[in-house]
Each structure stands twice: as C-alpha cells, then as structure tokens.
C-alpha cells in the first residue's frame, strides 16, 4: 500500500488531522450571520469528545468582554427565553469541560441578529392570578403579519417580512 516511509508518514499525518477535525464540535444553530424573528432562541452545537458538560456564552460584543448569558449545560442544546431582545446583534460560543473540570478552548464565535418587533400590542392584567403559562399567537389583518406573545405580553416571535396571517 505504501511505497515508502514518506508516503506512510503523510498518510498518518493526514489521518490524524482529519480525526481531530471530525471530533471537534461545531456550532449548529443559530447559524453564523443569520437574521431571526424571535427572541426565545434555541442554541445547538455538536458533541465534543470527552466533554462532560459545556459552557455557553452569549454576548453583544464580538470579544466577549461582557456577556448577557453564561451557562453550563450537560446537553447539546440551550434555550434562552429572558436575556435576548429585538433589534440586536449577538455573538455566541461554547467550550467543553471534561470530567476533571478542565475547560477546553472556546469555539470560534457565531453571530446572529434579531429582527424588529411588529406588534404594538399592550397587555393589561385585571387579575394576575388568572395568568396561565404559554403563548398567544395572533394575526394582524391590517398590517399582514403574525406574532406571538408570552404570558407577560412580550412579543417573542413574528413572521418578519412574510405576509402570513
């Protein structure tokens, strides 16, 4: 198979590089540079070898000098429902932590932007004890959009530029 030692060395080095790049996890969602029309955001990443859990950071600055979210997760997903807002650009990254508590290196960061809210709805609660968990989805026929609000009346999703009612 190998005609000389140099071919074997080249093959071995290439195999090692490919193995390392395949084993290192990658950020999956939200994808780099995308615009989303919701502020309850699912973050997903690929598994990294020997990771017991992951640290995730979300920041408004690309150098992560301050973070809006810093969390530890034992899964490959994280849902942020409170800290993100409309009309902002965010950066996110993860790093694995092994069972000895040793942190790996941070992944390259991805950025994403949140669109603008479309609803001008206001919520008034006459009896706060009647509030139930969940979301309310509605359509606005005059402006041709759909949106969802959470139990506190905060818009968390909209149809963006799509005219769906």
Where are these regions (language model features)?
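Short proline/glycine-enriched turn/loop motifs at strand-loop junctions of beta-rich domains
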Residues: 48-52, 141-143
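Recognizes extended acidic, P/S/T-rich segments that occur
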Residues: 53-87, 99-110
């Amino acid at each position: 198979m190998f005609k000389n030692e140099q071919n074997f060395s080249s093959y071995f080095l290439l195999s090692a590089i490919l193995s390392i790049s395949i084993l290192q996890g990658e950020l999956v969602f939200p994808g780099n540079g995308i615009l989303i029309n919701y502020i309850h955001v699912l973050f997903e990443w690929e598994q990294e070898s020997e990771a017991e859990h992951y640290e995730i950071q979300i920041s408004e600055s690309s150098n992560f000098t301050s973070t809006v979210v810093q969390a530890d997760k034992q899964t490959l997903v994280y849902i942020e429902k409170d800290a993100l807002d409309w009309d902002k650009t965010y950066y996110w990254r993860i790093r694995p932590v092994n069972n000895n508590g040793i942190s790996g290196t941070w992944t390259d960061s991805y950025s994403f932007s949140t669109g603008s809210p479309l609803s001008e709805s206001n919520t008034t609660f006459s009896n706060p004890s009647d509030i139930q968990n969940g979301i309310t989805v509605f359509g606005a026929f005059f402006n041709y959009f759909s949106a969802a609000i959470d139990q506190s009346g905060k818009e968390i999703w909209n149809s963006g530029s799509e005219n769906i009612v």
